[in-house]
Amino acid sequence: MDNIIKYLSAKGKYLLTAVLLGSTLAMSAAGGREVKGRVVDPEGNPIPGAVVNLAEQSRIVLTDQDGNFVLKDAGYDDEVNAKCIGFLTNIVTIEDLDTPLVITLEPDNDAYAHLRQVAFAEKPSKFMTESTSMVSGQELQRYPVTVLQNAFNSLLTGVQTYEASSEPGWSDTAMYIRGVRTLNSAARSPLVIVDNVERDISFLDAFPIDNVTVLKDAAATALYGMRGANGVILVTTKRGDAGKTNIEFTQEIGFQTLTGKVENQNSYNIALTRNQVRYLDGREPLYTAEQIEKYRRVSNGETLDGMDRYRYFNTNWFDVLYRETAPVVKTNLQISGGNNRARYYVSFSYLRQEGMWNSEGTKFNDRFTTQHTLNRWNLRSNLDINVNKYLRVGLDLGGRIDNILQPTTRVFDLTTFGAVEADPMRPVYCPNGELYVDGSASNPIYQLGSSGQERNRRRQLYSTLNVNGDLSPITKGLSTNLVISFDAFDVFQSTQTNGVDAYSYDFTNMAVTDVKDFTYTQTRKYQELTNPSANERANSWTINLRYGFRYDRTFGKHHIDANAFVRTYQQRLNVREANTDNGMYSSDRYLSWNGAATYIFDNRYVINGSISRMGNDNFTPDNRWDTFWGVGAAWVASEESFLRNENINLLKLRASYGKAGMSDTGAGRYPYQSTYSSNGGYGFGENSATWIPGYIESAAGNPNNKWEISKMVNVGLDWDFWGKKLYGSFDMFKEWRSDILVDRTTNPAILGITFAKDSYGKVESKGLELTIGHTNKIGKVTYSIEGLLSWNTNKITEMDEPEPAVEWQRKTGKRIFDYASVSSLYEWENRSAIGGWNQYRFVQWASDPNLISTSQQDAI
């Protein structure tokens, strides 16, 4: 693989040299005079920012604020193209070089002729055969989210997101396209492409985004080979336009709150339950009727008098631990502009997000705060330069810095083993104002205040060089493109520890009649915050290289758009433990040869195909390559003469079928090799004085381990009637997923070895997707209504499982999350049912209870 990548790098140099040489030769052959002109709308108003160029040439100029432009190297009878978003392209012929041209652009009422992003290309949406969904960056900005993909649920059909954690800096949002379609939990995420480069979507905010497109069927993702089976999310960022400098400043201040809290049992119910348990056990009650009444009153929010306020408590530990709201501040500055030669776009964002912890834990140690805080700085710049009429260069740079300050005690521990598990019958503070902690119960405020501090710093750098060469002087419609990207990532973590004073007192001693007579016992001692100690440091870098050619040309009623390219991807990760020489190194490399073509006849009939030959060095030399492909067809019925009508803006039927893969299966590096670990040993010499450690084969390798295969068929319908008064799309799909990595559970344990997972499982999935909307204008008011519907299901058709004792335990033939187990018959109750601890509670099973055998019910 190293030799292949070296060869490709060398080949890329020669190809780039050829592009530059071709551009130079084309320049030397050009000649002519200068011609001036103006671009206007039908009413004579100037159109700024219109793109103007001579036919057969790719060098463009942009009109200024008054619609004026100047073209060089023009000659008699040359054709001049003028186009602008929202208008139809117009082509005029130069008849007099001394007379300024006036080019009129008619409004474009066909919104479906605009280009949309697909795999490594752009297509008019009218002629797309793929199943896609798209949302603009402007719409994304309306959603007050700190994690971009959390807004996708409401905007993109077929996309589901689930936020498992909302900790500042550690927000974990799972994302699925067309649902969960594989048994392997490590292989469910879609591929994310930012400006045609594989990248993590979490480094982006909504401000620099122009649009997001989701590729959903296998025909659309085939060019991504063994990376595209779960769908692809294409993110396109904003670029600068020629004209005056535009500055936009945005400041957003918001507040976040908990969506819900666990409802713990109150002290009154716990007291009753404890007495009931003792009664059933034949023992005397733990609480008297008078005590039960006091617990009832305090549980109802009453304040008790005298010494009772120091003996009877109903502490809501969630209210103590959490605050009602936490601030979120987002600031953004965008600057864009340029001229005919160079254009730029710059975006700078700052995000500050605080966690939901109360400030109670901070006051016990004045050297630090226990609040969970994220400070994030995000910078992005996109630069486009017209080197000459045949060569354009783009340079994209971006970076992000995250500083995360948080308690070392994790949210799960503070919530589950703190607020949920803590006994409401115990106080937060002693009467003397010190924290209350005894040996049998937890205090979440103490846990928070004595948790110390953890600092995480993440730094990310992104860079992309994009070179486009126009080879039309050689062959009309031919162009070439080179993309090189380099990304780097670095993370550093350090921790500090501390201690907090805490006491207990004998509040159950009824002989005490004055609060000053309580006996206090110190249970925890104060410790100053220690100096930071480094935990670990990790860094990685990623290189992408893509080079190819594109041929885009129209012959009468025939249009051909074809491209061929080679693509490489290499990633290296280094992790080093603090103050040791221990660490980890890993790398990941891909190589693919790709081609795609689209043919359109008379704007009515469309066929396209794509193919990718991809290899990954993670598998055995004999099992590294596979071929992925996709085909599609579409009939644009609204272009037929018998349906052409001003009320039918679009009516299109499309279908596709393709094969894609997924190699990120979670199997680790080189799963075909066995792993070894230390285990036992043997003593040699007199009295076995010399001990030699032993090693065992801890897990067997599997040379048959490979990537998942997805084959999917998709049928869709798109429509737009009465100028978007009724528009939408409908898709049906079915997928056959095979070679899913699963555990071999039928191997006998007597072999004494952990078997490697095997590419053996199979799942079938199907679903429907519907988007329907209405847009209208009444007077000066424009309104829109849009609805999204996604439905999908799956079925396990093959996996390795032993023959179950009863049929309902079988997983094969059921949905991925639908098979039953004994544990699913229970739900976890709040940890305060009995004695401050939770109970398992039997719940009604949704399926037929007769399916459960009597012996199992008795066992339960």
PLM regions with names:
Residues 1-34, 88:
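Cleavable N-terminal targeting peptides that direct proteins into the secretory/outer-membrane pathway or into
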Residues 34-48, 199:
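Structural motif
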Residues 69, 90, 99-101, 758:
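Short strand-edge motifs at loop-to-beta-strand transitions and within beta-strands
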Residues 40-43, 51-55, 79, 83-88, ...:
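Short, acidic, small-residue-rich periplasmic hinge/interaction motif at the N-terminus
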Residues 58-68:
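Short, acidic Ser/Thr/Gly-rich low-complexity loop/linker segments typical of extracellular
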Residues 44-48, 70-78:
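Short Pro-Gly-centered beta-turn/loop motif in secreted/extracellular proteins
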Residues 382-401, 406-410, 418-421, 440-497, ...:
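Extracellular/periplasmic, surface-exposed regions of secreted and cell-surface proteins
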